[in-house]
């Protein structure tokens, strides 16, 4: 009986650990292209990602100079929603802006 209790305790401990792990985080990135205006990128960053003007400009410059810029990190569902919002807005306004989600 002692062995069964130990095995149950180990199982409960493992389950507790699994249930308390923080959710994976995902980065939402904008990718550079030759057509989307810098102003539109800043708009996206301030309106969808709620960045302040100064931070939005810094991310936009990363996109422009490094080819990719991190807009924020979120749980998977929120990251995918942000990505969809960016893609829908870009398409609606005629910009080829691309947005990707990567596990951090």
From Swiss-Prot:
Give the protein's biological function: Involved in the modulation of the specificity of the ClpAP-mediated ATP-dependent protein degradation.
HAMAP family to which the protein is assigned, alphabetical: ClpS
Q: Name one Pfam family in it.
A: ClpS
Subunit note: Binds to the N-terminal domain of the chaperone ClpA.
Protein's gene: clpS
InterPro entries reported in the protein's UniProt record: ClpS, ClpS_core, Ribosomal_bL12_C/ClpS-like
Q: What is this protein called?
A: ATP-dependent Clp protease adapter protein ClpS
Instruction: Write out the similarity annotation.
Output: Belongs to the ClpS family.
Q: Which SUPFAM superfamilies match?
A: ClpS-like
Biological process annotations from GO: protein catabolic process; proteolysis
